[in-house]
Amino acid sequence: MITRNDVEYVANLARLTLTEEEIEKMTKELGAIIEFANKLSELNTEGIEPTAHVLNIYNVFRSDEVKPSYPREEILKNAPSHDDVCIKVPKIVE
């Protein structure tokens, strides 16, 4: 069970200033979350393999493929400053 003091303590750790209404609301909401987590711990998970993903699929990214890009001249013509090879940007690190 989450108490008002628990919410105030966590808010203080997070450097949050909560109103009275927010403290009451957070006490109820966090209490409901803890209650739900406790219900989950009652589930019989014997024989169920642990998993890191909900679905049994991995590496679903597309493969790397070289594709045509804009011509260098087209890109450089839109740059405020360039040296015919690269875009020049202001120096920001000494």
From Swiss-Prot:
Recorded catalytic activity of this chain's protein: L-glutamyl-tRNA(Gln) + L-glutamine + ATP + H2O = L-glutaminyl-tRNA(Gln) + L-glutamate + ADP + phosphate + H(+); L-aspartyl-tRNA(Asn) + L-glutamine + ATP + H2O = L-asparaginyl-tRNA(Asn) + L-glutamate + ADP + phosphate + 2 H(+)
Sorted UniProt keywords: ATP-binding, Ligase, Nucleotide-binding, Protein biosynthesis
Signal peptide boundaries: none
The UniProt record lists the keyword Transferase: no
Pfam families: GatC
EC number: 6.3.5.-
A GO biological process held by the record: regulation of translational fidelity
Molecular function as annotated in GO: asparaginyl-tRNA synthase (glutamine-hydrolyzing) activity; ATP binding; glutaminyl-tRNA synthase (glutamine-hydrolyzing) activity
Function: Allows the formation of correctly charged Asn-tRNA(Asn) or Gln-tRNA(Gln) through the transamidation of misacylated Asp-tRNA(Asn) or Glu-tRNA(Gln) in organisms which lack either or both of asparaginyl-tRNA or glutaminyl-tRNA synthetases. The reaction takes place in the presence of glutamine and ATP through an activated phospho-Asp-tRNA(Asn) or phospho-Glu-tRNA(Gln).
Subunit structure: Heterotrimer of A, B and C subunits.
Record-stated family: Belongs to the GatC family.
HAMAP family: GatC
Protein's recorded name: Aspartyl/glutamyl-tRNA(Asn/Gln) amidotransferase subunit C
Species this protein is from: Caldicellulosiruptor bescii (strain ATCC BAA-1888 / DSM 6725 / KCTC 15123 / Z-1320) (Anaerocellum thermophilum)
Gene name, Swiss-Prot/TrEMBL: gatC
